[in-house]
Design a protein with these regions (language model features):
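Sec-dependent signal peptide recognition
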Residues: 1-2
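C-terminal motif of bacterial Sec signal peptides marking the signal peptidase cleavage site
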Residues: 5-8
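A non-transmembrane, solvent-exposed segment enriched in polar/low-complexity residues
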Residues: 10-166, 170
Length: 176
């Protein structure tokens, strides 16, 4: 009975599952988009006449991937069964990224977190002149704000423990 329960929860399901990653690149700087997991190429796609691409692959596991549209790249979190669309404009690469489809919530959150971290870097530079205790309070305030945003997201959508841990680690890393 325990085996049926564990199998039913997907804990031991190691079978690959299809993932779709596609979208549109406005003002492309390269004719290709390349998808990586760690440093390994998963697949590449040539942009069509409408600057659209699509990649279908069998995912062994969920995780952090990145796509490269030279000379830029960005991260994307893909899980088994995702069907994720991307739209971006290379003139404002990071600021224009929008995801839609299955997996959009976490990926749009990752983009927002990335952009917020860029902004925080400019703000934190001003804090270096403060006393250590006040500096720590300001940094902790920024961290708590991001954790509150994650908490709100978790109330709206169900995220895997792995991606939740990744986001928590990202928030903590950028606070220290």
């Amino acid at each position: 009975l325990l085996c049926v329960f564990v199998y039913g929860c997907g804990v031991i399901d190691k079978r690959p599952s299809p993932v779709y990653f596609g979208g549109e690149i406005v003002n492309p700087t390269s004719p290709y988009l390349v998808l990586f997991k760690d440093d390994q190429v998963i697949d590449s796609a040539k942009l069509d006449r409408s600057n659209r691409f699509k990649i279908n692959f069998m995912a062994e596991s969920e995780g952090l991937y990145h796509f490269d549209h030279s000379p830029q790249f960005h991260y994307v979190y893909l899980e088994k069964g995702d069907s994720l669309n991307l739209r971006l404009n290379t003139l404002e690469f990071d600021e224009s990224i929008v995801f839609s489809g299955k997996g959009e919530e976490i990926n749009n959150f990752i983009v927002e977190l990335f952009l917020a971290n860029e902004e925080d870097e400019r703000i934190v530079d001003q804090y270096f002149q403060l006393e250590p205790d006040i500096f720590d309070e300001k940094i902790e305030s920024i961290r708590q704000e991001k954790l509150a945003q994650l908490s709100t997201l978790l109330k709206e959508v169900s995220l895997s423990p792995r991606v939740t841990a990744l986001i928590n680690a990202t928030i903590d890393y950028n606070a220290f």
